[in-house]
Amino acid sequence: MINYRHLFFVVFLFFYGCVETLISVTIIPDGRYHVKIESQGDERDIKDKDFNLPSSSNWSVEEFQKQDIDSDETIFVRSAESLLSGRNFLGDNGQLGSLRYPISVEKKKGIFSDTYTLIQIFEGRNIDKKYPMLSKSLLNPGNNKLENRVQTEIIMYCLRRSMKDVSTDQNVEALLQERILNHFNGVFFKAEEENKLFEILNEGDEEKVEFLNLPEKLVRTNFKPFVDLLPRNFIDNCINRMRDYLHEANVTIQLNDDTFKFVGTLPGVVFSSNADSISSDSLWWIFDLKDFMNESFTIEAASVVYYPQKIQQTIVLGALVILIVLFFIAKRKAKS
């Protein structure tokens, strides 16, 4: 019999949705910069909140639909734009695991020129460290042996981190934490051997399969042997904290099929950048989750605006000073 839950999870993991996000940044001479972020794709995929567009009062937000010319499918579009200055912490909504992409633009005034520096960072997800099986699966889709263990790995990571966080306040010894983790590992190992792993993780929920859910009943059941050894409310606090870490994992998985394009326009002459390509006066970067799976992905560019008139004035002034000095030297020599 086909395990449809397993099949859906695998399909979701590797083919779920497709959202393309274009980030356009134009720096104006006074050092401020116009930012427009536009995501387009399936409406559900855009609203899954793996990539958060700014929505504060200083941003103009728009949502609309359009028809794809080739496929005649409906494309959902959400955009946000604003005029900013300095550094802005985009994507930081205060929720653990949200993709943050801070941006900074700096203008340095000089005597003969002004320099502009643009930096935007897509913070790394640290997948290799957090979920090594998921990392391998994303890089090698179709490996069933790895795919079968991804969900267990993520749940165990969430449990481990939540127990560590809660134990800091409730003083649960590290040895007891390890005993609990070993117990859960044993439960998952046995379920995998009996081909019941996805059943116990999904707890009979046929509908809610779009993302990883917390198997709360399973967690509470397997905490029972340790209830008398744990502080009051420890289990409840752990479960609440697990939801935060599970959100982080869901964001990472949902980012798997997202693509990003960044176009930057700077005043003057660009003298440094790590752009993928240059078109007219614009710098282009194209990237996806693989570029920030572990380490952060950084967009960097710098330009300079020279002021020829100031340079000419300085040269003329310098020449006049030299001539005056030479004149007085010559005059003094003539007198002597």
Question: For the regions a protein language model found, what residue spans apply to each?
Answer:
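Short, solvent-exposed secondary-structure boundary motifs
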Residues: L13-C18, F51-N58, F260, G264-L266
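Bacterial Sec-dependent N-terminal signal peptides
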Residues: M1-L22, L323-S336
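Start-of-domain marker
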Residues: V19-F76
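Acidic, low-complexity intrinsically disordered regions
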Residues: M1, S55, S280-D281
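Intrinsically disordered, low-complexity N-terminal regions enriched in serine/proline/glycine
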Residues: N3, F15, R32, V305-Y306
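Mature, soluble, non-transmembrane domains
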Residues: E62-L320, F328
